Amino acid sequence: MVVLVIQISYGGMTAGLKAGHVSDTWPLMFGKWLPPNLFNSFINIFETPQTIVFIHRWFAWLGIILVPVVFYMIKKQNYPADVQKGLLWLTGVVALQITLGVLTILSYVNIVIALLHQANAILLLGLAVYFIHRLRAVDETKA
């Protein structure tokens, strides 16, 4: 949940600073995995559009890694059907979010795609809260 909140926060900064216009290529920025001058100053992580969009992109990669890990852990624990169904929904919405994010970049921030990306972030946050709530409810009944 912490990763998701940070990611949504950086998404908000990306939109607010119009940082999505910084680089219209993916996965590289300016032809590099690590563009120069990203972290010249600590304040760059809050003020510099290039650094903000870089962090937003890399937190997406972290999500790509974490979702299968969580998926495997939940499947291994044999949670009830509604929790597993919620996990499938969560996985699908994460995949949609990443797809919309990449399409937003490649379309040079087409407003419709960008708005869908933001709306889907709200859906993703709601699903994550619901999913965590269900996990805790199941864990309490097991205890």
Predicted regions and their residues:
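Polytopic transmembrane helical bundles with strong interfacial aromatic enrichment
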Residues: M1-A143
